[in-house]
UniProtKB/Swiss-Prot annotation:
Organism of origin: Arabidopsis thaliana
Ranges of residues in domain ABC transporter: 359-595, 995-1233
PANTHER family, alphabetized: ABC TRANSPORTER DOMAIN-CONTAINING PROTEIN
Listed Pfam families: ABC_membrane, ABC_tran
Compartments (UniProt record): Membrane
Transmembrane segments annotated in the record for this chain: 36-56, 81-101, 158-180, 184-206, 264-284, 296-316, 681-701, 714-734, 793-815, 817-839, 896-919, 923-943
Keywords from the named record: ATP-binding, Glycoprotein, Membrane, Nucleotide-binding, Repeat, Transmembrane, Transmembrane helix, Transport
Protein name per its UniProtKB record: ABC transporter B family member 17
GO-annotated molecular function: ABC-type transporter activity; ATP binding; ATP hydrolysis activity
Family named by the database record: Belongs to the ABC transporter superfamily. ABCB family. Multidrug resistance exporter (TC 3.A.1.201) subfamily.
SMART domains: AAA
Principal place of residence: membrane
Sites carrying sugar chains: 70, 542, 609, 642, 769, 1015
Gene name per UniProt: ABCB17
A GO-annotated cellular component: membrane
Amino acid sequence: MGKEDEKESGRDKMKSFGSIRSIFMHADGVDWILMALGLIGAVGDGFITPVVVFIFNTLLNNLGTSSSNNKTFMQTISKNVVALLYVACGSWVICFLEGYCWTRTGERQAARMREKYLRAVLRQDVGYFDLHVTSTSDVITSISSDSLVIQDFLSEKLPNFLMNASAFVASYIVSFILMWRLTIVGFPFIILLLVPGLMYGRALVSISRKIHEQYNEAGSIAEQAISSVRTVYAFGSENKMIGKFSTALRGSVKLGLRQGLAKGITIGSNGVTHAIWAFLTWYGSRLVMNHGSKGGTVFVVISCITYGGVSLGQSLSNLKYFSEAFVAWERILEVIKRVPDIDSNKKEGQILERMKGEVEFNHVKFTYLSRPETTIFDDLCLKIPAGKTVALVGGSGSGKSTVISLLQRFYDPIAGEILIDGVSIDKLQVNWLRSQMGLVSQEPVLFATSITENILFGKEDASLDEVVEAAKASNAHTFISQFPLGYKTQVGERGVQMSGGQKQRIAIARAIIKSPKILLLDEATSALDSESERVVQESLDNASIGRTTIVIAHRLSTIRNADVICVIHNGQIVETGSHEELLKRIDGQYTSLVSLQQMENEESNVNINVSVTKDQVMSLSKDFKYSQHNSIGSTSSSIVTNVSDLIPNDNQPLVPSFTRLMVMNRPEWKHALYGCLSAALVGVLQPVSAYSAGSVISVFFLTSHDQIKEKTRIYVLLFVGLAIFSFLVNISQHYGFAYMGEYLTKRIREQMLSKILTFEVNWFDIDDNSSGAICSRLAKDANVVRSMVGDRMSLLVQTISAVIIACIIGLVIAWRLAIVMISVQPLIVVCFYTQRVLLKSLSEKASKAQDESSKLAAEAVSNIRTITAFSSQERIIKLLKKVQEGPRRESVHRSWLAGIVLGTSRSLITCTSALNFWYGGRLIADGKIVSKAFFEIFLIFVTTGRVIADAGTMTTDLARGLDAVGSVFAVLDRCTTIEPKNPDGYVAEKIKGQITFLNVDFAYPTRPDVVIFENFSIEIDEGKSTAIVGTSGSGKSTIIGLIERFYDPLKGTVKIDGRDIRSYHLRSLRKYISLVSQEPMLFAGTIRENIMYGGTSDKIDESEIIEAAKAANAHDFITSLSNGYDTNCGDKGVQLSGGQKQRIAIARAVLKNPSVLLLDEATSALDSKSERVVQDALERVMVGRTSIMIAHRLSTIQNCDMIVVLGKGKIVESGTHSSLLEKGPTGTYFSLAGIQRTLC
């Protein structure tokens, strides 16, 4: 109950966070100064127009009196022109402050916020991520889309709001000064303008939150698909993923339409300003007739009140951005403010002066928060003496890895305590505690950076010599040195550029470099080949000397030298003792496990006594090292020249095509039609209302009261009609464009993901195309396009319509004045266009930084356990700062440019008003136009100029939108080098499984200097089982990659059933091929859903799923879970143990009933008992199928029809298990078998 109460109180606190001040919590002293100056600029910007209108007051009254003569009239003109020019100069300074200060502080605060957010995410305990299965996509969204929303709010939307709000206030100040009676009467009408905006803001918060939840669900699906793209491709699950993605997006479309309707009602309600003008015109006429008020002053006051109302409407339209910023900020602040139960930032806690390393679990009870109904430990008691090696063995899912997690304080026990040197670990400083431990996990986690940087995660201040020594100790130095870039070689996202054994050795080096007091080895050698395992095991044995070591292993041969071996069963220690002591217990569980593994090894010997001397072992090791080095050195020159052909040029300039975007919107043409028509009619409203307002002024100077009453009645009815018309067309406009934007966004997201899932695997190997960066583009680009189509396009149509109508009316009324006024408008347009072009050129690096930040954040969350174990949070933050260094410098230039362009634009508007004012006065003085025509045209073009200026404020959004359009079509137009849906491809009704590699040359496109195969040939008979063995990194897994056609060879061909694999329809071919990878990739969903990914049809019976699970020895543990097959696997299967994940992956492969079965270390993560049963199941499944098995453990491949030993990128020898052993000590396979026997 306590935790629930805490959660509730936490929610209550969160409600108070969404205040305007909380958004500025990342501002420092400089930012507050910038915001203060920016506030002055924004408020001053709002005062400019009311001040200009105030200047008009004298002119209008002079124009309305018959006593005005040419001399006094021109003096008045000159006086006002000079005043306007002063205002123009002042407006440049004010608007420069507004543009520079807000842009600068927005980018500064956003960068600081991203850092604090990522720091807060990395601060959370592991249990937080267990409960948030979409945590990776959450972080990608917040670090990219949410931070961008807040940055836009600070840089542009907030100053716009302040400017409009101050314009509203300034207008009423001027009005009150000039005519307080009319102002007081008009003031209560503010309520009519406030209520719709406030209601819209409240509704939008709720809708925005729901839209984010829908997007987040869809983003999680996309992130899973992209990060596990090999699994998706192998099982032909592209359409399933796209279908789930599309379904998740449907809810957001409906919510988006509700949002558009709400916006239309709100903006339409602002048409009440026309009704207000109607009333004030009527009341003003009464003041003129009954109180002798001056007509010009009445008109100026009404204009100010109306302008103030329009400005208020503009500011209320910005409530959308306030709401979006608050919603985005709540999501970010929720994480920033969350203090985890196990806080790595907490500096309090005891630090032991001299740590011995004695570990004790005292009556520990534990369950995972994500599975509270499943008890892992009920009363665990375990004592590990200092400096001793203790091995934990037991069935998969028995809780072995949980011991390590508890010791590192990933979690805290529900009851009991864990002691180190007699001190409870919850009393020790968390970071110091973890710094005393070195962890090598079952599934090695590497970061998308260089090998050196990955090893330095273990010890930040280590020297290069220490890095090399650690690599040597883990047997990694040799293969690292063979790379052209050596230790600077990039490992790729999730270490994809390295083989499993290479990744594991780098991970071991990372653990060794910190010289820990306690060494934690969770299946540390499971991915290594026999020769590497022997050397690494010796290294680990040496590293264990003098320090407490906890070893988890399924292969009992690796733990026989442990001081103490503990057998865990059902969360209890059932047996304890040394290897020899436990073997004395004939009926003991450990004895049965050893017997089971010995049976496998004895069978592998087939009654042949294998005896290998240490010299032969070392000789073999040297031969393999030499052969690898030799093959690389001798073949690189002949192949490198061809690799570039396989690397597509994705650096083509992005060419946005708005026409193509509209073609994509073709299905919504009806909504587009009435949306555009409505927007055009909204545009007509502006010049028509301005024309009417200009005409009203002449009414106030009429001498006949009857005429004043009659004409006032006409204009009042006209304004009321405009109010009703505005309400209706705004609803139609915003709903129509919302419909267009939402469905276009959904279509873009679907098509982008669909297209991305056709790209060759190598595209995903490139650093810029990490899952984080791609998901960021999916979220950000589509959102920007929606904003451009839904909001900006409607404003563009509106503006064009207003300009056309204004020009027509102006030319009809007074063509001379109209031509001058029209000719100066392009200056404003050019100024804003310059802003767009220059800001676009400077925004590219900032956009790249966003992608880099998203990529880094996604990788950090995906590997949170490794980061937590090594206390590497600060290292990740340093990497984040590094990727933002360049964009931070560019932001300074962007800020200066924003200030200069905005200041110039605003001052130009005032200067053009001065010019129009002067020239119009000259025409009146010369008798070429009447004053009424001047008022009409002047107001039409002043208000139209404001419309153009408002449209100009969207140039940044348009620039960003066009960039996003270019980015979208860059993805949609990209031609993959391996087309999975080639319509001309051969669709086989059945595959026999005859596989041929003929003279194949291959090197990975991202590492063209490292040759894997040269002139490689192999024949794999249909229906037969073939095992591939060899040293780690020798190309075993590459064979599977080529068969799955993840890659194409540089030369030669890969054939299936005698047909070049490139001639097949790839997706149909993959239906007949099943893959079980070395590192099983599961998706967030239930166990049932994960197994069903192996189905080739949409309808799969429950009995088929259960049979597949039974074949993989998964059924029993699944049914033992409280939710059975409906148990949620968590993000990437985090809720399951390694063995459980592997068995589900095997069940998924079995369900496919393939013709070709590919097993890449399929049983490496299983304990002995499970491995035996699963191995039997696999052997049954392999019967009658072409099976290719990659294994380091030779006992698992002894029954294969053919065993192939790789070396030098060629086949060293091949044959059956017995025939290869008959070659004796001269045979490579014989030597490998001997090495494994010496390890047993």
